[in-house]
Amino acid sequence: MTTRSNAVVIILAFAVVACAVYEKKQPVEGDKGIVTAYVNAWNQHDTVALDTLLAPEGIHEDIAQNFRGRGPKQVINFMRGLIVAEPDFKWTITNSYEEGRVVALEWTWASSYSGKDPNGKQVTNRRISGRGTSIAEVEDGKIKRFSDYYDIASFFR
């Protein structure tokens, strides 16, 4: 290797380290912060963050979609399916309440949806939106349970 090649390799190595340090997320504080970070992980399609925030045996329920996943692997698979149907979803917390280890959220959801609507009709890139609530239980800095409640039909009105 030439001196110039060595210099390029060193510069690239510094760039990679700088990016890694820059991208490092700040620690999350408090149960509400953990739950907010979980919602942000969904918005960013960040399976690594989701894996970090959900307890190994943590449960995520989406009551409207009849989904109940245990552990990060099942929840990440659900997330990936949702990303296929709604690649641009935006989950926005409008209010949050914390009492002990329980965090309650009010939220809105908006996306372009492709798939079957609640009536079984195939739709492509249809804009949907709606409101819902979630109840989360945090234990030892991890989400033990996260349950979503909403009327899925209202998203298609």
Indicate where each model-derived feature is located.
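Short, low-complexity N-terminal intrinsically disordered segments enriched in polar/charged residues
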Residues: 18-56
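A short hydrophobic beta-strand element
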Residues: 101-113
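Short beta-strand edge/turn micro-motifs at domain boundaries
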Residues: 104, 129-157
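Bacterial N-terminal signal peptides
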Residues: 9-17
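A solvent-exposed, acidic/Ser-Thr-rich amphipathic alpha-helical stretch
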Residues: 48-100
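A mature extracytoplasmic/lumenal domain signature
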Residues: 64, 95, 109-111, 150
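Short, cysteine-centered beta-strand-loop-beta hairpins and adjacent loop/turn segments enriched
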Residues: 66, 83, 110-127
